[in-house]
């Protein structure tokens, strides 16, 4: 799973560069996310999912596992959810667990 990270003063933005997070890639995604978040001290971690067209239950579980792996003082936020991925979060009520930003990371400059 290819992920690209960009760190600012108080936010680490991680962009998923594949079109799906599923059973075949969930473990690799989770391990890479833990590596990237472990190398950062930013209190906010934003996962840009704008290129993710498909997310199955394994992928959703991997995103939740990343959230649980962060220190209690850090937040995992999501951005750029496609309609299909947004539906998965809504149907599973995970949209109440995560802060979800509309659009991509450009809109995060003004997000609080």
Model-derived regions: residue spans:
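Short acidic-hydrophobic, aromatic-tinged amphipathic segments that line or gate anion-handling sites
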Residues: 99-103, 107
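STAS-typified acidic loop motif
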Residues: 5-31
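Amphipathic alpha-helical interaction surfaces in cytosolic regulatory modules
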Residues: 21-98
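Residues that form or immediately flank small-molecule/cofactor binding pockets and catalytic motifs
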Residues: 8-10, 83, 105
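Polar low-complexity intrinsically disordered regions enriched in Ser/Thr and small residues
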Residues: 11, 64, 106-110
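Short histidine
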Residues: 16, 34, 107
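Non-catalytic signal-transmission and effector/linker regions of two-component phosphorelay proteins
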Residues: 1-5, 109-112
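Short secondary-structure boundary/capping segments
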Residues: 3-5, 13, 68, 90
């Amino acid at each position: 799973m290819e992920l690209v990270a960009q760190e600012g003063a108080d936010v680490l933005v991680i962009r998923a560069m594949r079109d799906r997070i599923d059973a075949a890639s969930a473990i690799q995604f989770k391990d890479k996310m833990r590596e990237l978040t472990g190398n950062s001290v930013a209190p906010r971690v934003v996962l840009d999912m704008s290129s993710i067209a498909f997310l199955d239950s394994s992928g959703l579980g991997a995103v939740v596992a990343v959230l649980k792996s962060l220190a209690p003082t850090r937040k995992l936020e999501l951005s750029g959810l496609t309609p299909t991925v947004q539906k998965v979060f809504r149907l599973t009520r995970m949209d109440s667990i995560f802060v979800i930003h509309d659009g991509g990371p450009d809109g995060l400059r003004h997000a609080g």
